[in-house]
Amino acid sequence: NTDWNDAAYQTGVLHKHNVNISGGTENTKYMASVGYLGQTGILPNSERKQFNGRTNMDMNITKKLTVRLNMSYIKNDYKDPNSNYGGGWSDQIIRQLNILSPMIPVYNEDGTYGATNDGNPIAWLDSGQTVDKYNQNFTGSLAVDYQIIDGLKATVSGSYVNDDQHFKAFVMKLDTDPAQASRPNSLEERFTNWSRYNFDALLNYDKTFGNHGLKVMLGYHAEKYDVRYNKEYRENFPNNELDYMFAGASATQTN
């Protein structure tokens, strides 16, 4: 009488830490913060690690000139348990846990895994194979205001965003059922990077003359967006420890 869910699930743990500082003078204000989040999931081999930082600064250089600087950074590392059943990753593991018969044992008396046509999800979890996802993002902006004359202000600002992502899914060759041939081990990797640049120049005039007012705005905007993407796949690696793309059989490569 096998309880598949009890055999697989664990208690997830989350811890979070933050440090913030702020201060300044009459002409300068600043704020900075850093944070860390660590989390383990309810399935073995599932976890998340996040680091983030942010800083803001406002400066009155002169009575007419002000500068604003903002920067932020965040990095996430995810691990998700992988399955050997045609993709699906942890979703496939959860599906198997919910449909397997309680008449099938997790382990046989001889220590081998209980056999099913679709695979044994506990064997997948015990192998330690994971889907690894990495993402980092940086955002920075700078703005300068200058009061040219009474009512006339110029603002120049620019910003930059860069986002980097890496996906890696290695499927091990697991011989858990002697009566059924194992699929070859395989590796899929995806690399994505995008960046965006913005530039703005504004000239604002706002003046009241008695009962009349005049508002005029002139502006210029420029933007650039770059994207780079690469996907690779190979099979038949010499062993389950050498999970680098160059080690797979070149004849099986797809891009």
Predicted features and spans:
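Outer-membrane beta-barrel channels and translocator barrels
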Residues: 14, 25-26, 62-66, 147-149, ...
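An active-site-proximal structural segment forming one wall of the substrate-binding cleft
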Residues: 152
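Residues embedded in well-ordered regular secondary structure
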Residues: 1-44, 82-85, 121-132, 144-147
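Surface-exposed loop/interface segments of Gram-negative outer-membrane beta-barrel transport/assembly proteins
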Residues: 1, 41-48, 52-139, 155-255
